[in-house]
């Protein structure tokens, strides 16, 4: 799953559509974690919710 401490354990590498992006990022294959309040790891999840354990 996503590292709950990603905001401190990963470098902030930029922004996308107004939210922070945490690296590493190596487009097009490694996309990093997007968001600071709700983080989505685009390398683990495609943001459709299917990767979330509830």
From Swiss-Prot:
Binds 1 [3Fe-4S] cluster. Disulfide bonds: none annotated. Residues 1-36 are annotated as: N-terminal extension. [3Fe-4S] cluster binds at residues 45, 51. It comes from the Archaea. The modification N6-methyllysine is found at residue 29. The keyword Nucleus does not apply. Residues 9-20 have a biased composition (Basic and acidic residues). Its cofactor is [3Fe-4S] cluster; [4Fe-4S] cluster; Zn(2+). Residues 35-54 form the 4Fe-4S ferredoxin-type domain. Keywords: 3Fe-4S, 4Fe-4S, Electron transport, Iron, Iron-sulfur, Metal-binding, Methylation, Repeat, Transport, Zinc. Residues 1-21 are annotated as: Disordered. Zn(2+) binds at residues 16, 19, 34. GO terms for molecular function: 3 iron, 4 sulfur cluster binding; 4 iron, 4 sulfur cluster binding; metal ion binding. Ferredoxins are iron-sulfur proteins that transfer electrons in a wide variety of metabolic reactions. This is Zinc-containing ferredoxin A. It comes from Sulfuracidifex metallicus.
């Amino acid at each position: 799953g996503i590292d709950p401490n990603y905001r401190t354990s990963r470098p902030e590498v930029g922004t996308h559509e107004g939210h922070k992006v945490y690296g590493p990022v190596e487009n097009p294959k490694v996309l990093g974690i997007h968001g600071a309040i709700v983080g989505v790891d685009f390398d683990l999840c495609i943001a459709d919710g299917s990767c979330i354990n509830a």
